[in-house]
Amino acid sequence: MSEQLVTPENVTTKDGKINLLDLNRQQMREFFKDLGEKPFRADQVMKWMYHYCCDNFDEMTDINKVLRGKLKEVAEIRAPEVVEEQRSSDGTIKWAIAVGDQRVETVYIPEDDRATLCVSSQVGCALECKFCSTAQQGFNRNLRVSEIIGQVWRAAKIVGAAKVTGQRPITNVVMMGMGEPLLNLNNVVPAMEIMLDDFGFGLSKRRVTLSTSGVVPALDKLGDMIDVALAISLHAPNDEIRDEIVPINKKYNIETFLAAVRRYLEKSNANQGRVTIEYVMLDHVNDGTEHAHQLAELLKDTPCKINLIPWNPFPGAPYGRSSNSRIDRFSKVLMSYGFTTIVRKTRGDDIDAACGQLAGDVIDRTKRTLRKRMQGEAIDVRSV
């Protein structure tokens, strides 16, 4: 369990009420205890909030009137609002969601046997990966718990409503939207706890995936806080290329990153012993057969499956998407070494909802020095 403190600063709304979406179950029970109520009352309210996407205390019919009145005085259930919706020809839906005076983007991806929600963890991103649209927006701030779990809540409510008739309920959540989740552990972990909680969304830990570009101290900390599936944004077979396209590699190189991944796998049950490697395919940058051989050698001691991601363009980007033939040759080399290798099907690129295309609406781009300071505060690891 995470140990984020429930304080007026991090859960109180502008009108002085506690937003219950900011509280995981442990914190919710503490809140109800302070109200003089039994812990099971907290569980009842959570069930209404997440099983039925209910944000009106008066509709919680198994909660007595006195408690409902008390809750209306001191608390609320306020999820961020959708301000724009775009639908792709392939069924993907992208929502622009208001967080204060800015926006983040959340993507719903339906498939035959599942529906995946791609969730953002920050407004913008500080890591400056060269092939990613979000990185070009700069970093503004971390999202609160209510703004992270609120994306899932809002999407579940929309999908369950008549306006999205026929859409599958959300079965998987991936922390692969805007931002680096490990730079916002204090909010991301409680939000994921709610995703997993039986009184929350009740998802399997194998169906909640966190993706990271390699903030090593925070990855070590994550393994002591929660067990979820892990995906890593590797994107290069050597430090020379990765230094260029994923600048955090200059601080935590590939060897250091993969060692941390193996430490996480030793603690984790959710990953079933292997990590997902994400590898964006950039034309004549990292997609040659020689790169595939290097990657196979690099990963020989790391149990994994490999997702090859055709790069999704955005205005002003200096790269091109690898051709299908180059991707096919790359994939065949990896499979010849025995690696499970999947070429990710591009979804939602006609509405800029594909991997690496999320941008949101980030204002007042933060200066590099402030971003570095915020990174350290966000994960509470002074050595970062």
UniProtKB/Swiss-Prot annotation:
Residues 111-350 form the Radical SAM core domain. GO terms for cellular component: cytoplasm. Its EC number is 2.1.1.192. InterPro entries: Aldolase_TIM, Methyltransferase_A, RlmN_N, RNA_MTrfase_RlmN, rRNA_lsu_MTrfase_RlmN/Cfr, rSAM. It is found in: Cytoplasm. Binds 1 [4Fe-4S] cluster. The cluster is coordinated with 3 cysteines and an exchangeable S-adenosyl-L-methionine. S-adenosyl-L-methionine binds at G179, E180, S211, S233, L234, H235, N312. Belongs to the radical SAM superfamily. RlmN family. Reaction proceeds by a ping-pong mechanism involving intermediate methylation of a conserved cysteine residue. Specifically methylates position 2 of adenine 2503 in 23S rRNA and position 2 of adenine 37 in tRNAs. m2A2503 modification seems to play a crucial role in the proofreading step occurring at the peptidyl transferase center and thus would serve to optimize ribosomal fidelity. This is Dual-specificity RNA methyltransferase RlmN. It comes from Escherichia fergusonii (strain ATCC 35469 / DSM 13698 / CCUG 18766 / IAM 14443 / JCM 21226 / LMG 7866 / NBRC 102419 / NCTC 12128 / CDC 0568-73). The gene is rlmN.
